[in-house]
Amino acid sequence: MSKDPGRILIFDTTLRDGEQSPGASLNLEEKLAIAHQLARLGVDVIEAGFPFASPGDFKAVNKISEVVGGENGPIICGLARASTSDIKACYEAIIPAPKKRIHTFIATSDIHLKHKLRKSRKDVLSIVPEMVSYAKSLVDDIEFSCEDASRSDPEFLYEVIQLAITSGATTINIPDTVGFTTPSEFGKLIFDINKNVPNIDEAVISVHGHNDLGLAVANFLEAAKNGARQLECTINGIGERAGNASLEELVMALHVRKSFFNSFFGRSSDSPTPLTAIRTEEITKTSRLVSNLTGMNVQPNKAIVGANAFAHESGIHQDGVLKNRLTYEIIDAKTVGLNDNKISLGKLSGRSAVRARLEEMGYDLSREDLNDAFARFKDLADRKREITDRDLEAIVSEQVQLPESRFQLSHVQVSCGSTSKPTATVTILNTETHTEDTSVAIGTGPVDAVCEAINELAKVPNELIEFSVKSVTEGIDALGEVTIRIRNKNKIYSGHSADTDVVVAAANAFLNALNRLIFSEKKECIHPQFDNLENSEKKVFSNPKN
């Protein structure tokens, strides 16, 4: 049997695999904000990125290692392909972390070996011990992944795993890379690994999976029943294609059905000991932060964190819930931190009162960020009678989200109606030339007119592919959250903003997306799975401090 920590370890890969969602690119400040919140959430491991990908990724992993990792905090992990240059860059990035891990991988399925790596099984059996041993010479905590394990020949898989453990791997990850397997198959795969790998008791078995068939969470729970003790997941289930296994769904399944799962951990069914170290009351806030910063909206009927997760429309259901919530709810909304507390703050409230409430909510802002957030709070308080925690979350998350900006909104005004053509006048500041320019444009609606005017000024080719707006809270004076996604050269960029005036929010969201596009074009990135290893070997990003 594999090494058993006595509970499930939660390995969060939102900042690595989650960020590979189209349009979900994050800047350094956003990654730090998410990493800090993941630490508050109580995850065991944060996979902070792929350091070899770009100088920006290296810097983000390095900074997270420096300020988020701690003796009592999460392990900070970096991803590296099975190459010396990748592993070296990863090690240099995670050096500041008191608890650090190198996560290296190579494909083991025949389809990947033939068509992607163009290597033989013999080649893999030579590479694995060499690269794992090299990583082990740098740090003690080594995770090794057999990419596309669920489509690999089992006998070859056992051989690779045994070699990796012999060479120093302390965690063995079994990925369902393309979301191909079913729960019973995945559970059997983990069972068979435990049965057929002689030294498996020297490593923790981890699982990683994608949701292409909608089975990722079910697969993971079956894997846990069969000995997997680390689950690799993302907030809101974001990730490439159909996404990854959802952290909140996994954690709450283990929380709500603890009496069922306890026996698979050698416990009595009524054992009160939690199966994970997650602070469930932080789930909703973490979900909202990731959604706001990535621009990836959560579907309303998403389990645990969707807007409708605790809503009841049917009269019969409403009646039952009013009499006893347990009739139709298996989770108390407060367990996941869902509340809409109205706070006694208004336009006369001072900076210290706002800071105190933000600290109660778990936000620790710098003096500069607090000043900016307070200014936005005062502006909102002048326009909105009641301020909720949700309003404060929107203010803070937007403050964190602001990307590097070449263009900033100075002024926007629209004219529209049933008998007039929607017209927008927009003035933007170019931060490079320190000049302001104004344009007037006509569109099919006020938002379209605003975007047309901005495009005339910015002159950055793009195609607007998504515009969405939602109310942060109830009431006609509620903040409106706008998310805009644009495309350029087959890449997608997101912008997000909130304001009581949705036209102003739309203008800022569009400019945020444009700024991301502009600055991302200056950064060359490597994809850990799709880019050819040999062609990228020459490109090494070293620690800027060295």
Curated annotation (Swiss-Prot):
It comes from the Bacteria. It catalyses: 3-methyl-2-oxobutanoate + acetyl-CoA + H2O = (2S)-2-isopropylmalate + CoA + H(+). This is 2-isopropylmalate synthase. SUPFAM superfamilies: 2-isopropylmalate synthase LeuA, allosteric (dimerisation) domain (SSF110921), Aldolase (SSF51569). Pathway: Amino-acid biosynthesis; L-leucine biosynthesis; L-leucine from 3-methyl-2-oxobutanoate: step 1/4. One of its GO terms (molecular function) is manganese ion binding. GO terms for cellular component: cytoplasm. InterPro entries: 2-IPM_HCS-like, 2-isopropylmalate_synth_dimer, AIPM/Hcit_synth_CS, Aldolase_TIM, LeuA/HCS_post-cat, LeuA_allosteric_dom_sf, LeuA_bact_synth, PYR_CT. Keywords: Amino-acid biosynthesis, Branched-chain amino acid biosynthesis, Cytoplasm, Leucine biosynthesis, Manganese, Metal-binding, Transferase. Residues 408-546 are annotated as: Regulatory domain. CDD domains: DRE_TIM_IPMS. Pfam families: HCS_D2, HMGL-like, LeuA_dimer. Homodimer. The gene is leuA. The lineage of its organism: Bacteria, Bacillati, Cyanobacteriota, Cyanophyceae, Synechococcales. It comes from Prochlorococcus marinus (strain MIT 9515).
